[in-house]
Amino acid sequence: KRQIYKRISGCGSGTEYMAVTPWGDLYPCHQFVGDPKYLMGDIWKGVTNTAVRDEFKHCNAYARKECQDCWAKLYCSGGCAANSYHATGSITGVYEYGCELFRKRMECAIMIQVAQNQELAAQGIEVPIQLGSTCNACADGEACE
């Protein structure tokens, strides 16, 4: 069973992983290496610039006003912080070209899945489609809407 997982953050840069230079400097990801604004610390003293870590901690789909009404916001989750930074000057900016590409990829993936399900149905193979999920909060145990 193939699933596309929902997530809040586009990546774990600065929080779940960091880039380490040959000299021991720590950056949120490899795309920020050499930018003094995003130097987080080094391997000897650890993270000393906690403001950068905190900035990346709050970099998610909910931090971007432009993402609020997007149907794909919990799949792309605001995308790559470095792409946003290089396109807009802010890690919470919106890299519009990346958004368009991601939404188109999701649309294509959905259409491919629909086509595959139609082929299976034409062969008489039942393909269950789950429109809701049973949360057991409802007295009748039916799927929530």
What are these regions (language model features)?
Residues 7-9, 59, 88:
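Residues embedded in well-ordered secondary-structure elements
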Residues 16, 45-48, 104:
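Short capping/connector residues at structural and topological boundaries
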Residues 37, 62-145:
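Radical SAM enzyme core and accessory elements
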Residues 1-35, 75, 124-145:
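A C-terminal junction/extension of Radical SAM enzymes
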Residues 1, 30-77:
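C-terminal accessory region of radical SAM enzymes
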Residues 21, 27, 41, 81, ...:
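Residues in well-ordered beta-strands of folded domains
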